[in-house]
Swiss-Prot record:
Protein name: Spike glycoprotein
Membrane-crossing segments per the record: 1395-1414
Region (Fusion peptide): 1026-1047
Origin superkingdom: Viruses
Coiled coil among keywords: yes
Annotated segments matching region S1: 19-791, 32-780
PROSITE patterns: COV_S2_HR1, COV_S2_HR2
Subcellular location: Virion membrane; Host endoplasmic reticulum-Golgi intermediate compartment membrane
UniProt GO cellular component terms: host cell endoplasmic reticulum-Golgi intermediate compartment membrane; membrane; viral envelope; virion membrane
UniProt record similarity statement: Belongs to the alphacoronaviruses spike protein family.
UniProt-annotated stretches for the region Interaction with host ANPEP: 661-805
Residue ranges, Intravirion side: 1415-1453
């Protein structure tokens, strides 16, 4: 049926004839001329590894079909249930580009994207393109494909917008010898086109069916036309490829178990030692010396660079040896490298779910010094010193616990632990680390070689041995195993690593800073006369054996300091420069404490000096550390800290002594690497290269350059942010500048490749050599800027003619890397739009009531910082004072935030007594307070009372001023943590109950305070808003009017645009009442319907979910804050009292300091979350105020602000921590689509100007008759545009302003950076504190009681069925609220005045016109009366002029 419908659709569009299998005949492409090796060429073209590899996939190994037809019509065929599709050309004329064949279209169906391969052989399509480039692969999101566009239109009309296009050639040199095709899965697509394979990362749901459209006349000659053969592949096959010394062979791999294991575990490393893309990483694990990563994506340094991969199907009984140095890579699969081998990885693949190791297996580690340690495991515990039974490491799944030991000559040196239940990988590093499944199982001295013997028997074992080196890579881990690797080995991959994604979308990305690595060290010091002291420390280790033969370092080991003042216990530095060195010796004894023999074998040990409690390391003392005083002592008296001296054996480290340090901070004494006595300037400068510098005590990494500047004052110069800008060499006065090693740059990435980069300096980067300049940056690109007009000059839009793929401000970057301006419009005497876009304008409406919840306030929280951190311990409180004002800052931040919020809420919530009296169903239907003219109305509430009874408060509800919906909301919500403040606090202070989480919060200084707003006040506020709607809605008055008239006043505004007449009000009222009734039922039944909620209840469900989240978020945060008291933050205990009981005061202070740091960090995280939440609520509160003013108190003219539609009126109800708005809107049901113009760009010769519409509520569009019209956006009412509707603007360019976060305060004055506020808190802490990792992503979430009802419904099928039936009825009722209004298609609307207004106007005209005529005609010097008077006066006397006084110049001061 589907195929028939599709055929009919295709026929209707393209006159397509659907063919059946009878129209296609089987063919064999290898029988065509030159196609004997087509399969081999295809496989080896895709996989170039050497020497052998097994590949699996959906390869073209099935039947080929030739579907050529005798008629010249276009034909259609479907391929179903396939995972790959291939096609090949039988022949095509090898011309100069004008192919004479017919087109082919291949459509791979999927969601959300589909892929189309289109081969156009028409002369018109080929001519404007490069020769032989008339194939196109299009990745499109279009759901409906118009095949006629592809088979007739030019390429410029197809694959538009965001569709990805890959053009390719389809006429190879040897006709018909190349296979084209697609292979797909849910993660990526492989396209075999243009003599290469494209790996496209596409996450998609493929339907596994393909549609092809083709056309070929069988009457055409072989030399003049093309015929295609097709193959859809549904079977997964394996091939074994061998490529040795250029000799290529292949064979079908039919042993499924062998082929699967080989293809899964064996690969051929590519050039450089990289693991090829697509490898499964079966049983490859991350190396870790601490915790194991479960899942995630991160950049790490791992042994993933393969120097040699040795596939081993099975081992014999003989022992195998593998060495790190001088390894012979004679059996490598693929390339082999001579790099240093860091880790040898044994990757194991076992198909049997039983114990796989059939014989004895012992790993022998040849460590430094020739001592061989053995790693073996036993199935029971062994208590004797000699292990008479032979152990083994069982590979695969073990049948019981295995206890592992490190052995030497049959003696257990160390118990390692229990072997994992399933051993999949063993990795051994040359530095002595032994990993099992990625975990560091054992560490010893560096290892030279590894040997072991293994018998796999018939277990189906399959091995690979990889000689690997460490490299940086982006690793994706799933369930602790590696799933995908992206090497950070190129410019584009470095960006991928910095963005933590293997697939980069088109756009601009910051260029990751290159790792500095090992660089020269520059030191700048003041010249001085140096006296130097060399301190040589000798450590004599004493080693002996335990009763079981394990090596033990004696505490009688000796430390010798240089003699000073006949004292060898304390040595103080008395010079201004010093260097510290130590060397160790090792002596052993049998059982006593007389150490007079050299240490051999496992008794050999070396001395190491560990940091201990000092804030600096022993090996860093000679790295220019400065002190005022520095002494070494063997006694702890007066010491500031100590170094731990340990003996390091092949199995462990044992602390034998302590070396104490007495020091004072300062800069009089400096530790230096070597002796430089005398008058010296010890400064060492490395110019014009990246260097690690220490300049007058300021350290960093940068490039030092000599300048020509002259500055008389200062030694070094910094910016306002503290960065070092330059310094002066006091010896010669030369000024040097210091600049970063890396410059700021942004790379333009298109289709996974870097095509350009914007940088601040004119220097080549990212391998880009071609450049041009703009007013703001330099641009480097793959585009060849060699023209004199573009090289080094500002770019002009005429330089490059291309379509930008990505944009940055008003600049675009094309696929070829060219940079173009995108806001310049060129025209000559023609009218062009500034910008256009299709818009839909409604032509008819229905009514809808939409629910919206907005949070208004949060519950304030008070925290006693010292109580939370120290729980009243006096010693802890003393330590807490060292953190300066940390607690004060935390407490003030919470207090100020709470006060600010309370002030804002208090100013927002005000209640009108008059309005509150009317805010009830009873008052709306009462005539006591109304004007007498309304008392005769049968229903004061009007037609709208049926719906209002659930929104308006009722005196008969549980509480006064609450509506039915408010009662439902407050009854349904159950708060978590500290919701009911009074009840919880009273219960906790009783002391008779076991302290639960709520009590623990109060006991530890956390208390929720009652806020300004509560449920009753919010209910009164919203009720007052409802009552205020009917106060003075017709211009103001002391007496309320019926709600129906208030609503009618709101409808009058809409009537001016939508022709809503009075007779439609009853229709709207009925729809409103029905919608409100169904929403009320939805609030009551959403607990029964949350899992099967439909579209009709989606709004209500979302609102309740948001209410639940708002109410419980703070409780969850407080619960998590309290749970942090159980975290020990790497201390020995989470109890402060317990720590002081178990340790001495000094050690306990160090442990408690960790608790203080961790708990302050937890408080800071909570404060940061609270401040962020308050900022969000502040914005939400402002939004609520705006909606109250614009939606409730008035009628909004903004479309979508008060509900998604044309706003009529809104009512508000109180809800937990906020308000719920019920927006009554008109929703469009019919639309007219027009192409809107934002303006007109007109030119006349050299003059160019723009015209834009004056009224922003009007839309300018060009109709089908090529005439311009204006129409309101709210209703399609086209009128002819006039000149008065436009405003002229200067030009047509569209400009944008780029701003950084630093620039935002200058643009938005009230912008607050919350992160900076928290940073200010952290800066007040001690500088030497350490912040532990404190993830806040797991909360003890508490949900509404809806969840329990949902779970209960799952066990009551009968009730669920009934609920489903009720919901179906309810959904139908909601859907029935959509009503059609009467539509009158009127272009213009005239307002008619009543008859008495016209009568009044007539009387005024009759009275005023005679008076005006008399005044104008009879008065004045030229009037009738004036003329008559002048004549009479001139006859009787001569006209006299009045005398006047002369005017003098007056100066006013």
């Amino acid at each position: 049926m589907i195929v028939l419908i599709l055929c009919l659709l295709l026929f209707s569009y393209n006159s397509v004839i659907c063919t059946s299998n009878n129209d296609c005949v089987q063919g064999n492409v290898t029988q065509l001329p030159g196609n004997e090796n087509i399969i081999k060429d295809f496989l080896f073209h895709t996989f170039k590894e050497e020497p052998s590899v097994v590949v699996g996939g959906y390869y073209p190994t099935e039947v080929w079909y030739n579907c050529s037809r005798s008629a010249t019509t276009t034909a259609y065929k479907d391929f179903s249930n396939i995972h790959a599709f291939y096609f090949d050309m039988e022949a095509m004329e090898n011309s100069t580009g004008n192919a004479r064949g017919k087109p082919l279209l291949v459509h791979v169906h999927g969601d959300p994207v589909s892929i189309i391969i289109y081969i156009s052989a028409y002369r018109d399509d080929v001519q404007p393109r490069p020769l032989l480039k008339h194939g196109l692969l299009c990745i499109t999101k279009n759901k409906i494909i118009d095949y006629n566009t592809f088979t007739s239109a030019q390429w410029s009309a197809i694959c538009l917008g965001d569709d990805r296009k890959i053009p390719f050639s389809v006429i190879p040199t040897d006709n018909g010898t190349k296979i084209f095709g697609l292979e797909w899965n849910d993660d990526y697509v492989t396209a075999y086109i243009s003599d290469r394979s494209h790996h496209l990362n596409i996450n998609n749901n493929w339907f596994n069916n393909v549609t092809i459209l083709y056309s070929r006349s069988s009457s055409a000659t072989w030399q003049k036309s093309a015929a295609y053969v097709y193959q859809g592949v549904s079977n997964f096959t394996y091939y074994k490829l061998n490529n040795t010394n250029g000799l290529k062979s292949y064979e079908l791999c039919e042993d499924y178990e062998y082929c699967t294991g080989y293809a899964t575990n064996v690969f051929a490393p590519t050039v450089g030692g990289y693991i090829p893309h697509g490898f499964s990483f079966n049983n490859w694990f991350m190396r870790t010396n601490s915790s194991t990563f479960v899942s995630g994506r991160f950049v790490t340094n791992q042994p993933l660079l393969v120097n040699c991969l040795w596939p081993v199907p099975s081992f014999g009984v003989a022992a195998q040896q593998f060495c790190f140095e001088g390894a012979q890579f004679s059996q490598c699969n693929g390339v082999s490298l001579n790099n240093t081998v860091d880790v040898i990885r044994f990757n194991l693949n076992f198909t049997a779910l039983v114990q796989s190791g059939m014989g004895a297996t012992v790993f022998s580690l040849n460590t430094t010094g020739g001592v061989i340690l053995e790693i073996s495991c036993y199935n029971d515990t062994v208590s004797e010193s000699s292990f008479y039974s032979y152990g083994e490491i069982s590979f695969g799944v073990t049948d019981g616990p295995r206890y592992c030991f490190a052995l030497y000559n049959g003696t257990a040196l160390k118990y390692l632990g229990t072997l994992p239940p399933s051993v999949k990988e063993i990795a051994i590093s040359k530095w002595g680390h032994f990993y099992i499944n990625g975990y560091n199982f054992f560490s010893t001295f560096p290892i030279d070689c590894i040997s072991f013997n293994l018998t796999t028997g018939d277990s189906g074992a399959f091995w690979t041995i990889a000689y690997t080196s460490y490299t940086d890579a982006l690793v994706q881990v799933e369930n602790t195993a590696i799933k995908k690797v992206t090497y950070c080995n190129s410019h584009i991959n470095n960006i991928k690593c910095s963005q933590l994604t293997a697939n980069l979308q088109n756009g601009f990305y910051p260029v990751a800073s290159s790792e500095v690595g090992l660089v020269n060290k520059s030191v700048v010091l003041l010249p001085s006369f140096y006296s130097h002291t060399s301190v040589n420390i000798t450590i004599d280790l004493g080693m002996k054996r335990s009763g079981y033969g394990q090596p033990i370092a004696s505490t009688l080991s000796n430390i010798t300091l240089p003699m000073q003042d006949n004292n060898t216990d304390v040595y103080c530095i008395r010079s201004n420069r010093f260097s510290v060195y130590f060397h160790s010796t090792c002596k052993s004894s049998l059982w006593d404490d007389v150490f007079n023999s050299d240490c051999t074998d496992v008794l050999y040990a070396t001395a190491v000096i560990k940091t201990g409690t000092c804030p600096f390391s022993f090996d860093k003392l000679n790295n220019y550390l400065t002190f005022n005083k520095f002494c070494l002592s063997l006694n702890p008296v007066g010491a500031n800290c100590k170094f731990d001296v340990a003996a390091r054996t092949r199995t462990n480290e044992q602390v034998v002594r302590s070396l104490y340090v007495i020091y004072e901070e300062g800069d009089n004494i400096v530790g230096v690497p070597s002796d430089n006595s005398g008058l010296h300037d010890l400064s060492v400068l490395h110019l014009d290269s990246c260097t690690d510098y220490n300049i007058y005590g300021i350290t960093g990494v940068g490039i030092i350059r000599q300048t020509n500047s002259t500055l008389l004052s200062g030694l070094y110069y910094t910016s306002l942010s503290g960065d070092l800008l330059g310094f002066k060499n006091v010896s010669d006065g030369v000024i040097y500048s210091v600049t970063p090693c890396d410059v700021s740059a942004h790379a333009a990435v298109i289709d996974g490749a870097i095509v350009g980069a914007m940088t601040s300096i004119n220097s080549e980067l990212l391998g880009l050599t071609h450049w041009t300049t703009t007013p703001n940056f330099y641009y480097y690109s793959i585009y060849n800027y060699t023209n004199e007009r573009t090289r080094g000059t500002a770019i002009d839009s005429n330089d490059v003619d291309c379509e930008p793929i990505i944009t940055y401000s008003n600049i675009g970057v094309c696929k070829n890397g060219a940079l173009v301006f995108i806001n310049v419009t060129h025209s000559d005497g023609d009218v062009q739009p500034i910008s256009t876009g299709n818009v839909t304008i409604p032509t008819n409406f229905t009514i809808s009531v939409q629910v919206e919840y907005i949070q208004v306030y949060t519950t304030p929280v008070s925290i006693d910082c010292s109580r939370y951190v120290c729980n009243g311990n006096p010693r802890c409180n003393k330590l807490l004072t060292q953190y300066v004002s940390a607690c004060q800052t935390i407490e003030q931040a919470l207090a100020m935030g709470a006060r600010l919020e309370n002030m804002e809420i208090d100013s927002m919530l005000f209640v009108s007594e008059n309005a509150l009296k009317l805010a009830s169903v009873e008052a709306f239907n009462s005539t006591e307070t109304l004007d007498p003219i309304y008392k005769e109305w049968p229903n004061i509430g009007g037609s709208w009372l049926g719906g209002l009874k659930d929104i308006l408060p009722s005196h008969n509800s549980k509480r006064k001023y609450r509506s039915a919906i408010e009662d439902l909301l407050f009854d349904k919500v159950v708060t978590s943590g500290l919701g009911t403040v009074d009840e919880d606090y009273k219960r906790c202070t009783g002391g008779y109950d076991i302290a639960d989480l709520v009590c623990a919060q109060y006991y530890n200084g956390i208390m929720v305070l009652p806020g300004v707003a509560n449920d009753d006040k919010m209910a009164m506020y919203t009720a007052s808003l409802a009552g205020g709607i009917t106060l003075g809605s017709l211009g103001g008055g002391a007496v309320s009017i019926p709600f129906a008239i208030a609503v009618q006043a709101r409808l009058n505004y809409v009537a001016l645009q939508t022709d809503v007449l009075n007779k439609n009000q009853q229709i709207l009222a009925n729809a409103f009442n029905q919608a409100i009734g169904n929403i009320t039922q939805a609030f009551g039944k959403v607990n029964d319907a949350i899992h099967q909620t439909s579209q009709g209840l989606a709004t209500v469900a979302k609102v309740l979910a948001k209410v639940q989240d708002v109410v419980n978020t703070q409780g969850q945060a407080l619960s998590h804050l309290t749970l942090q008291l159980q975290n020990n933050f790497q201390a020995i205990s989470s109890s402060i009292s317990d720590i002081y009981n178990r340790l001495d005061e000094l050690s306990a202070d160090a442990q408690v300091d960790r608790l203080i740091t961790g708990r302050l960090t937890a408080l800071n995280a909570f404060v940061s979350q609270t401040l962020t939440r308050q900022a969000e609520v502040r914005a939400s509160r402002q939004l609520a105020k705006d909606k109250v003013n614009e939606c409730v108190r008035s009628q909004s003219q903004r479309f979508g602000f008060c509900g998604n539609g044309t706003h009529l009126f809104s009512l508000a109800n109180a809800a937990p921590n906020g308000m719920i708005f019920f927006h009554t809107v008109l929703l469009p049901t019919a639309y007219e689509t027009v192409t809107a113009w934002s303006g007109i760009c007109a030119s006349d010769g050299d003059r160019t100007f723009g015209l834009v519409v004056k009224d922003v509520q009007l839309t300018l569009f060009r109709n089908l008759d090529d005439k311009f019209y204006l129409t309101p956006r709210t209703m399609y009412q086209p009128i002819v545009a006039t000149s008065s509707d436009f405003v002229q603007i200067e030009g047509c360019d569209v400009l944008f302003v780029n701003a950084t976060v630093i620039d935002l305060p200058s643009i938005i004055p009230d912008y607050i950076d919350i992160n900076q506020t928290v940073q200010d808190i952290l800066e007040n802490f001690r500088p030497n504190w350490t912040v532990p990792e404190l993830p806040l992503d797991i909360f003890n979430a508490t949900y509404l009681n809806l969840t329990g009802e949902i779970n209960d419904l799952e066990f009551r099928s009968e009730k669920l069925h009934n609920t489903t039936v009720e919901l179906a009825i309810l959904i139908d009722n909601i859907n029935n609220t959509l009503v059609n209004l009467e539509w009158l298609n009127r272009i213009e609307t005239y307002v008619k005045w009543p008859w008495y207004v016209w009568l009044l106007i007539g009387l005024v005209v009759i009275f005023c016109i005679p008076i005006l005529l008399f005044c104008c005609c009879s008065t004045g010097c030229c009037g009738c009366i004036g003329c008559l008077g002048s004549c009479c006066h001139s006859i009787c006397s001569r006209r006299q002029f009045e005398s006047y006084e002369p005017i003098e110049k007056v100066h006013v001061h």
